[in-house]
């Protein structure tokens, strides 16, 4: 097959799509290039359906090869290790964007693999993986209702930029990655520095318009490769008569169950209804062995129809009766309670409860040594702010093995971390590494948003001087014809009902983090603005409830947190603190019980739970790095005698010269007549030249001590010591 290329311009960048050159045995493969960044995306779908499952078996893996940036992995085996957080989050973004577009009921196991094979240090590769996944699926025979395309939208100096470079992103006050089709925004994930809802809507519509050429390029690529027909498959059976019978037997019972407020009571009743349904069908078929056997064989199908009844009833209840589970209105938020400082030895802690969702959150303050070090394509990255989200099985009353965090937990943690990162103080004002851990104690929807709220409370309890409090809210939108219902603070039952599910975090002034999944077309600007406005109202209500526990950060950090003091020294004196083989700094830390971190610019951070220990370490460092001041008198030690003068150590690592003419106000024939090695001598600094060489005077120091000016005293000159 001859390689086929199509190009599209997105903003200032040209994106190349190429197929037919590599990975030709995959069912679809596309080479995506922007600048010198290249991602290879492949898709393969099994020939046979996977039995015994009730979900679409899709796997997405995004991987960054370090050779793409000319780097050798730093691991022992010099191979890439477990997925980084960015790889996991990008895999989730591709999955969330593509999964809803596969044909309903498609049962074949499908895998998307996106591999970064070249990285130019300017153009990020996650958007290329997203577009490449759609393109590879679009030109394959896999039943996929695409195409879609990915784009990153930034706002730099008030102007929107499509696919900004890494340098532009560093200056942006808005940074979102999104996927869009011709008539709908499909997925949104990103953060911002307290931008308004209006700006966010403008950004999303700008992004949707920016991908049109990319969509055309994918269509052209499919046509050029022969417009391969989609493979046939047997969709799930839809027995209308059986479906209606299930509805008739369960509708009123489901209605009664959803009137119950308590989650476990409601779930228990819904489970009983399912059992009653199967029993009723068996009793109806009593005496007919063939019908009984059919019911047993179709039990999974019957349960599916029952789930459809629940889904249909809840949507009708919301759109027709304007009523939700528990009797709440569309904009009503569950009862909120907050508590801080409940863990006595923790640097900062909170317990945030909203309805039946609860998060226990702890904040720990660490030093620069506690920063997370991550090897990425851009080099070694150091993270000084982290939020880790944990979802133990007891939070939903289940029994499961405790394992390492899954993709969902990593994704929820990243969303909450992004929301709070925007209000964290800069390192020069708060030189701590900050780790937040959110453990979900119970869950009935919006647990990631509870982590945002609880995380903010624990930061303030820890005395972290955040810019402003942050809250998060999970929203849902249901659209039935012209009827639209926007739900604030959705429950777990409502989570999968919506045509648009979105989470918005921010301060009272604006949005700091957003996540959206939109499953339908026709979501207009007006609907987006209305949805985000309702989310803003809910967010401000939650902030008010949080303020009842703590409204501003504590004035001081916990007594159990390390005290960090940063001092500055001249960079050339760093070697004096470290010493040969690190001997000096090890001695200081051992004797004072402190942790010391030195930056290349001469910033020295000393940390210890005891301020007295910090001061002791500072004193030792100052003694090693103090500078001679012009006009100041010191008691030094003679280290070497020469014909022209004597070299005197003022303090460790700092020597000066007393010229023979500066030894006495009388003529000195030989230096050794006045001084001897090892002798202590009073001297005055009379000059320091640009090279740092120090001139000393014994005669001026003695005269000053005697209260008179010596004859022929030298004028002090030179540059002050730095």
Swiss-Prot record:
GO molecular function: 3'-5'-RNA exonuclease activity; magnesium ion binding; polyribonucleotide nucleotidyltransferase activity; RNA binding
InterPro entries in alphabetical order: ExoRNase_PH_dom1, ExoRNase_PH_dom2, ExoRNase_PH_dom2_sf, KH_dom, KH_dom_type_1, KH_dom_type_1_sf, NA-bd_OB-fold, PNPase
Matches recorded under Pfam families: KH_1, PNPase, RNase_PH, RNase_PH_C, S1
Names of the cofactor(s): Mg(2+)
Chain residues that bind Mg(2+): 495, 501
Domain KH residues, every copy: 562-621
GO biological process: mRNA catabolic process; RNA processing
Localization of this protein: Cytoplasm
Positions of the S1 motif domain: 631-699
Gene Ontology cellular-component terms listed: cytosol
The enzyme's E.C. designation: 2.7.7.8
Origin: domain of life: Bacteria
Keyword annotations from UniProtKB, A to Z: Cytoplasm, Magnesium, Metal-binding, Nucleotidyltransferase, RNA-binding, Transferase
Main location: cytoplasm
SMART domains tied to this protein: KH, S1
PANTHER family hit by this protein: POLYRIBONUCLEOTIDE NUCLEOTIDYLTRANSFERASE, POLYRIBONUCLEOTIDE NUCLEOTIDYLTRANSFERASE 1, MITOCHONDRIAL
Entries under NCBIfam families matching the protein: polynuc_phos (TIGR03591), PRK11824.1 (NF008805)
HAMAP family noted in UniProt: PNPase (MF_01595)
Function: Involved in mRNA degradation. Catalyzes the phosphorolysis of single-stranded polyribonucleotides processively in the 3'- to 5'-direction.
Family that this chain belongs to: Belongs to the polyribonucleotide nucleotidyltransferase family.
Protein name (record): Polyribonucleotide nucleotidyltransferase
């Amino acid at each position: 097959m001859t390689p086929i290329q199509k190009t599209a311009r997105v903003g200032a960048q040209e994106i190349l799509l190429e197929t037919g050159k590599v990975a030709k045995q995959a069912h679809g493969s596309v080479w995506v290039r922007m600048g010198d960044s290249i991602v290879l995306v492949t898709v393969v779908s099994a020939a046979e359906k996977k039995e015994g499952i009730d979900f679409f078996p899709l796997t997405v893996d995004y991987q960054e090869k370090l050779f793409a940036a000319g780097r050798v992995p730093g691991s022992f085996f010099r191979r890439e290790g477990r997925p980084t957080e960015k790889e996991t989050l990008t895999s989730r973004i591709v999955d969330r964007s593509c999964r809803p577009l596969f044909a309903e009921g498609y049962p074949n196991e499908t895998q998307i693999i996106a591999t970064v094979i070249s990285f130019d240090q300017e153009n990020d590769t996650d958007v290329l993986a997203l577009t490449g996944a759609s393109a590879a699926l679009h030109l394959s025979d896999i039943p996929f209702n695409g195409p879609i395309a990915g784009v990153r939208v930034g706002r730099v100096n008030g102007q929107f930029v499509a696919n900004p470079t890494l340098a532009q992103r560093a200056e942006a006050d808005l940074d979102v990655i999104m996927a869009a089709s011709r008539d709908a925004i499909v997925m949104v994930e990103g953060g911002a520095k307290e931008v308004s809802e209006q700006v966010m809507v403008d950004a999303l519509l700008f992004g949707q318009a920016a991908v049109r050429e990319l969509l055309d390029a994918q269509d052209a690529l499919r046509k050029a490769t022969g417009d391969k027909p989609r493979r046939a498959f047997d969709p799930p059976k839809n027995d209308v008569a059986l479906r209606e019978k299930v509805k008739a037997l369960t509708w009123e019972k489901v209605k009664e169950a959803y009137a119950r407020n308590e989650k476990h009571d409601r779930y228990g009743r819904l489970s009983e209804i399912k059992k009653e349904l199967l029993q009723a069908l068996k009793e109806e078929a009593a005496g007919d062995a063939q019908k009984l056997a059919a019911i047993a064989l179709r039990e999974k199908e019957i349960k599916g129809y029952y789930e459809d009844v629940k889904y249909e009833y809840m949507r009708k209840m919301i759109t027709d009766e304007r009523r939700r589970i528990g009797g709440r209105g569309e904009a009503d938020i569950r009862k909120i309670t907050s508590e801080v400082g409940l863990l006595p030895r923790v640097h900062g802690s909170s317990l945030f409860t909203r309805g039946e969702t609860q998060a226990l959150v702890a904040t720990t303050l660490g030093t620069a040594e506690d920063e997370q070090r991550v090897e990425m394509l851009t080099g070694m990255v150091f993270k000084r702010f982290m939020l880790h989200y944990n979802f133990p099985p007891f939070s939903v009353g289940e029994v499961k093995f405790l394992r390492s965090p899954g993709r969902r937990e990593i994704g929820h943690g990243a969303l909450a971390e992004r929301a709070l990162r925007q209000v964290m103080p800069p390192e020069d004002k708060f030189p701590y590494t900050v780790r937040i851990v959110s453990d979900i104690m119970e869950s009935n929807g919006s647990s990631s948003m509870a982590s945002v709220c609880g995380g903010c409370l624990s930061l303030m309890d820890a005395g972290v001087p955040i810019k402003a409090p942050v809250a998060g809210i999970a929203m849902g939108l249901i659209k039935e014809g012209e009827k639209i219902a926007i739900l604030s603070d959705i429950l777990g039952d409502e989570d999968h009902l919506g045509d648009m599910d979105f989470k918005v975090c921010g301060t009272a002034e604006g949005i700091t983090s957003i996540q959206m999944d939109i499953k339908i077309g026709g979501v207009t600007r007006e609907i987006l603005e209305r949805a985000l406005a309702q989310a803003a109202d809910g967010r401000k209500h939650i902030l008010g409830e949080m303020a009842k526990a703590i409204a501003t950060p504590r004035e001081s950090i916990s007594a159990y947190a390390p005290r960090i003091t940063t001092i500055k020294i001249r960079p050339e004196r760093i070697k004096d603190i470290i010493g040969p083989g690190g001997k000096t700094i090890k001695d200081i830390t051992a004797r004072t019980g402190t942790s010391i971190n030195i930056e290349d610019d001469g910033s020295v951070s000393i940390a210890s739970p005891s301020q007295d220990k910090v001061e002791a370490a500072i004193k030792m460092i100052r003694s090693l790095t103090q500078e001679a001041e012009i006009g100041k008198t010191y008691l030094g030690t003679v280290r070497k005698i020469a014909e022209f003068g004597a070299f005197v150590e003022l303090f460790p690592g700092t020597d000066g010269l007393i010229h023979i003419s500066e030894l006495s106000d009388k003529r000195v024939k030989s230096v050794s007549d006045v001084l001897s090695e090892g002798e202590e001598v009073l001297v005055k600094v009379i000059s320091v030249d640009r090279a740092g060489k120090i001139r000393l005077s014994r005669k001026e120091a003695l005269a000053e001590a005697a209260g008179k000016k010596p004859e022929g005293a030298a004028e002090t000159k030179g540059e002050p010591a730095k």
